Amino acid sequence: MVTTIVIACTFRAGTTHHSWCAAVALRAGSFAADDKSLLARFYHADRALTAIASELDSFDGRAEPVRCTRLVSRLRQGQDRVLAITNQIMDELLGDDRAQRAFRVKFPEEVLQESLAGQLWFGAECLAAGSSILNREAESAKMRPLAKAVTKSLEIVRNRLREQCLRNNTPNSPTLRLDINDAATEQLYESLKIFDRLFAEFELVYVSAMVQVKTKQEYEMQELICVLFSETLQRALKTGLLEQEQVDSYDPALMFSIPRLAIIAGLVIFREGPLNMDQPADNISEMFRPFRKLLIKMRDLLHALTKQELYQLEKLLCTNEEISASEQLICDEKGRSGGDGGSGSGGTAAAGVKEFDALEPVGESQEHVVIVTTVTTTNAPNVVGDGPGATGCTDATSGADGRLHIVSQGYGVSTGATGSSGFGSGRGGCSSSSTSRPKQRHNQAHLRQRGAPRHSSQSFAPEASYAGDDREPVVEEDNNNHLRKEIEEEDVDDDMEEEEEDEEEDEVDDDAMLKDGLVTTDCASGYLIPNTNFGNLLQTNEAPLTDSFIATDDELRLLGAETASSPPAMTQANIDSILAASAAGSGGQQQQQQQQQLIDSDSGHGTANHSTDMSPELETERTVVAAGQPNANDAPLDGSVSKQQPVRDRSRSGSSTVHKHAEISESSSDYEEADVDDEPDDVDADDDDEEEDDVVGEVEEQNDSEPTFNRKVGGAPKEAFRSQLRCKAARNHRKSSHHRPRPSTSSSSSSAAYRNKSQSHQHHHHHHHHHHHSYAESAEGTSSVVSTITTSNNSTSNGSTRHHSRMQQQHQQHQQQRNSSSSCDTSPTQSECSDAQEVALAIRAAGRNKFKSTENLLHRLFVCIAGVADQLQTNFAADLRKMLRSVFIMNSSPPEPDEPPEPSGSEEESKDSQHNHPSDLFEFRASEQDVITADQQNHSGGSSQSIYSAEEANPEQDSVFGSSGDSSPVRRTASVESRNVTVNVSVSVVASSPVGAGGAGGGGMVGGSRTGQERSVSLSEACIVVEGGKASAGGGGGTRRHSASGSKNDYGRSRSSPSSPVNSNTGGGGGGNHHSSAHHTAHEQQRRMPEEPPRWIPDCDAPRCMACASAFTPFRRRHHCRNCGGVFCGVCSNLSKPLPKYGLTKAVRVCRDCYIHEVGV
């Protein structure tokens, strides 16, 4: 395309074209080519541009495309030069009247370059000529009037500047010397103001149409992210994750650590900041908007971490070290001292929890999540013997099956407990002590890492963990449950006989259903990191999982085998660690709650999706059969569990209705009637705060290998019958009161029978996966691990508040009960399930439960957080560099006042000559640790300097060193960075004197002053110096200090060589031999010791290549020559050559001139 540039010439009124041409002809010779004044430079640049435009108009570009392309490139370069000089003139003439260009902060960094003005001019001329931007015809049409105004205004400015060149030019004048009273100067001033305003408007519109420009809202969001980075850095400095030295030295590792830590801080600590994922997506910065869903999942998992785990994750993100499971276990073991495996009080539980505040979840501090894994052992109901004294909390004498509740995820246990747990014996209730969260996590680690629980299904001596009769039951509301003890005894007996007959008929069906339910195993974790990609790291259960995290049938059988083979001592030790903080309420009440939580939970998921389901519809509690193992050696359990006739009828009919849980009510025909809840009722923990604190269940296991336990297994049927009668009396009372309180715990056997009855009822109706086995099956039981997610809240209200809350919630449950198809409800927490906070807790628990161990969870979070943070380095590199540069400036240590040096003798003269050297103002290191160059303390260069310089990393970690004086702030920074690169030492070189002269001059040379300055040397130099010193020490000659630098002539093309050490010698006492020895030493060491490399020219002082004068751009980067220190483009410095004189034995980058020079040498 041929670009036609119309140059309109306008003249002042009264000036004819002939006179102007004559003036040009007269003054043309006065502009010398070397004139550096602004007007002279503008005149030559404008004249060259006019010539190129004329040549372009003289031929058809389509006929000669190569020539046209070459001339267009020259045209754009000429436009850049003209506009650059025009900007300098406007800066001098307009000053503060220039148009504001604050909008440039919204531009991408790659747009802001020196050729931007020329591109804008070229685009304005194309638009004014009728062209359009590709695929942006609408924007082009809107910009065309403004483009025409810009080109017209620019031509007016060019004409008036040419006129001023002929009128008021002063050769080599650093400033403009225009006649202020002249009308032409005033017109020029106004023309420049108009052009500046129009050009700024066109710049904003044109760049916005070509590239994506940040809006005002996005810019403010990035400012908030910058503040988040700064707050994160300050927090990391306080917690010891980072060091102030790293900030002061601009450690490049912080460019990765700060964004990673900021993601955690924004999601967990500063929740209302820019990373608040609860706000709409439009209010989130575009930096994190693509990762919104992933960040939400990461936030949920981070809230489930304890403070210790969170600190370990942050440390891992800073150091990139491997996750050590032993360190986690050490933290867990420390928490063991706070929990007592024996008996304790509720106050001890609360104190134990407060003691480990550091292990609390980082989410809500007052609401914790407990994952309970229950091992159920079900056996045939061959009841023998009579257990005397079975009046306390329900144990194996009245329990229908043995349940071992294991806290498998230590998210938190309930605090503020006032009662004791319901783990009881035949003698009475027992009070369990607090079990700290570290202990729970310890159990969880063993359960998940070893693939089997650390307990056994064998029996143990219950007296070891019973506390006797010191627990007083808490009687809440129902005081009439002890009435009507003998009223329905005969009905219960009849029901028992009928149910035992029915169990034999349903045994085969139950086994088949259970095996079918165990075919689909539970997923215990997510993906293996090496076998997945970034997108599915936190994927939910809907996607297929990696096989190594899925529990197979073999693992399930191994799990049951290890459960059956563990010793009783291990079981007792684990039971002590299982019992969590005791909450208010008696044992019977808690047992009833736990049975309902474990049995009445969401049993309609045979595939056990609870561990990975992250959807909001996730129920807050699910019971999933994870393993099953026949156990023929288990002793028969109590067979005094009543089963109802409607239950038998329903199980015979084979109804396939899928239900959440069945509900128990009392009918008019002396037996209980069960119905199916058609509503998808979410089963949560109790609504009562007191009962919700009683989360961790009881331990009831049996085995015929323990005689003591077997005697208790054969409990008295009569006591069970009475407890059932009490349970019915309690239900009648609740039915007449129009609300459904918990049965009173004044009699623990009542709750035992009630639980047994409900358990039997529930197991018959949970036919979806039938984790219950009929009590009538012959000596063959099933051991199943049941993972139950429950939630518990801290009990912060007093008794009356809890009572009032319970009354209201039970009233709501009663209203729901009358509207539903069920006759009654066993879990009065349906109204509370709608609470969003409870659902969130359950979601977090389910999210964490899908990981095998804490190590796996931390590793997954590390990969995701590091992936998001590192992706920002690619997608928003320029914005991230700007923000990190601001963070470094804000958080760097204030500059310390320079201490005046205290030199003496020749040292003072040498150092003074060095410190006064102008080249010491700048010092640049050839190291990858240069994030922000040191000269930015005095210069406002762009952040691209460090990017261009970062490529010049010396493979041998060579460094450029300057003076050793402490007064330079650059030297202080260099010494901070010198941990892995340099060693700042004063090298003492031992040199042997000539033969015959070394012994005589030895004493004087030891006491003599230094002949050269002390300087810092790199590692390679230090090795050479030490080797040279050892070699010369064998000669027995005298010693003296010598500088590591050679003479002045050895530096070649170096522009900053210090004074020669020979010339700086003093007459402090050495005589002629001493002086001659110095000369000899300098020549000897010159061959072995490397010279000082030349100082690099600062990037901001080299806008163009020093060889071809090409301007540097983001694509034409700066490269320093290691031999001369000059700045060149990649074409002019594409050669490499070893430089032994500088200690560089490997090939390094050199410019072409130095390459020719070195090869010639």
Swiss-Prot record:
Compositional bias segments (type: Basic residues): 438-453, 728-742, 758-773
InterPro entries associated with the record: FYVE_LST2, LST-2, Znf_FYVE, Znf_FYVE-rel, Znf_FYVE_PHD, Znf_RING/FYVE/PHD
Gene3D superfamilies: Zinc/RING finger domain, C3HC4 (zinc finger) (3.30.40.10)
Role according to the record: Negative regulator of epidermal growth factor receptor (EGFR) signaling.
Start and end residues of each stretch annotated as Disordered: 417-510, 583-831, 890-918, 935-978, 992-1014, 1029-1095
Compositional bias (Polar residues): 935-948, 956-967
SMART domains reported in the protein's UniProt record: FYVE
Zinc is among the record's keywords: yes
Protein name, entry field: Lateral signaling target protein 2 homolog
Membrane spanning residue stretches: none
Basic and acidic residues bias spans: 468-487, 1081-1094
Gene Ontology BP annotations: negative regulation of epidermal growth factor receptor signaling pathway
Sites where the protein binds Zn(2+) 1: C1105, C1108, C1129, C1132
UniProt source species: Anopheles gambiae (African malaria mosquito)
Keyword Amino-acid biosynthesis: no
Pfam families per the UniProt record, alphabetical: FYVE (PF01363)
Entry GO MF terms: zinc ion binding
Biased composition (Gly residues): 419-429, 996-1010
Composition skew (Acidic residues), residue ranges: 488-510, 669-704, 896-910
Composition bias, Low complexity: 583-601, 743-757, 781-800, 807-831, 1054-1065
Zinc finger residue extent: FYVE-type: 1099-1159
Superkingdom, taxonomy of origin: Eukaryota
Family membership noted in the UniProt record: Belongs to the lst-2 family.
GO cellular component: early endosome membrane
Residues annotated to bind Zn(2+) 2: C1121, C1124, C1151, C1154
Keywords: Metal-binding, Zinc, Zinc-finger
